[in-house]
Every structure is written in C-alpha cells, then in structure tokens.
Amino acid sequence: GLEALSKLQPGDEVTLMGPIGRGFNFEKPNHIPVLIGGGVGIPPVLFLAEYLKNLNQGLAPLAFFGSELPFPFTSVKSSIRIDGIKNNCNASIADMENKDIPCRLASLNDFEGCYTGYVTELAEHWIRTLDQKELKQIVIYACGPEPMLKAAANLGETYQIDCQLSLEEFMACAIGGCAGCVVEVTLPEGVAMKRVCVDGPVFDAQSIFPRSQTLQ
C-alpha cells in the first residue's frame, strides 16, 4: 500500500476507487470547529482546517497539534491570540498562520514555543474560558493515536461537547472485504463490530469510548 505509493514517480498513473467510508459531519449550523491532531493524525487535520476555512459557511476553525517528535512542518511564532493560552505558548504551524487559522502546538519534549504537556490538555485550557452557550457551539474533530483520541472523547464527555474521532487502524484491503480493521462500537441497540475502512474512519466519540471507558 503505502510502500508502493512511496515508490511512485512524477508522471506515473494510479487507479483509484472511491469515495469509500464515512468522513466528518459538518451539519451542525454555525458551530465552532475545534481540531485536535496528534502524530500521524496531524496531516489530515491540517487539510481539514483548510477545507473548513474554505467552505464559505462562516466557520472559524481552531487547531491544536501534538507531537513527541520534531514537527515535520515549518513552525512560526503566532500573532493570533487564543484565550486561555499563555503568551509563551506561541508556536504555530506556518501554513495555519498564513491562512489566519488560530493554532498552537504541544509536546512533552519542551520544544520552543510549545505547550509542555498533552495536546488535549492544551485544548482544555481554551475550553475552560468558554461559557455554557459557547460550549454548545463547539464540535471537536480529532485524529491521532488511541490515547489521544480517548482523551479527546473525555473532553467531550466532561464538557458535553459533540466529538468526532477519525481512527487509525491497519487496513489490508481497505474496501470492506477482509474485516481486518474492525473495531468495537457501542450503539443504542448494543455493541457491534464496525470496519474502519467503510463504516469509518470517523465515528462518534461516545460510540468508541463509552462513558465507562473515558473515566478509566
């Protein structure tokens, strides 16, 4: 899959099949998109931020990214203020800054300008500045490793915020045939096994991490 793609050269032809799967839902009117990306979940969230910015629906995304490795993107000192975030936490991704998208970075490795801690903790600093009316306007969109997604789901549970998670799973066929990427999902009618490639990769946070799990 990815190894074969990495060997392609400019001008090579590729056959694609799609669209397949279920993406993020943006139907909630006039909401505030809060984007959380970690590790290999950073690139898709960057594209999501740009997509939301260009929707022409008046949406103003706010992005938080976390990594324990040096960020593989040019970082800059942000000139965009974010309430609840200390002034010394000012590192942003240059592409986000150029598109006027508020953004902050987090890491446990004390990178310059980054929040020292988990990216979900950084997002919570901002969330705590909001009143109940503002909280109801938020939708969290997250992509990253499972512990980060669980923490994002916990944010949603704690503050009663809608939260959607894009899962990372190994996929063999990626068209729903092999069932190699199934995850356990809790639905109103009970527990079911869903394929991330065609039933996801995006799921409601509480279906992946029910309340009993977010509190663990």
Pin down the residues of each PLM region.
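FAD-binding FR-type
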Residues: 1-34
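Histidine-anchored nucleotide/phosphate-binding helix
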Residues: 44-56
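Short, glycine-rich nucleotide/cofactor-binding loops
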Residues: 32-43
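Short glycine-/acidic-enriched loop or helix-start segments at secondary-structure transitions
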Residues: 26, 45-47, 151-153
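Reductase modules of NAD(P)H-dependent flavoproteins
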Residues: 64, 69-216
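Short, flexible coil/linker segments at domain boundaries that flank nucleotide/cofactor-interacting
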Residues: 28, 56, 133-135
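Conserved S-adenosyl-L-methionine
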Residues: 30, 54-61
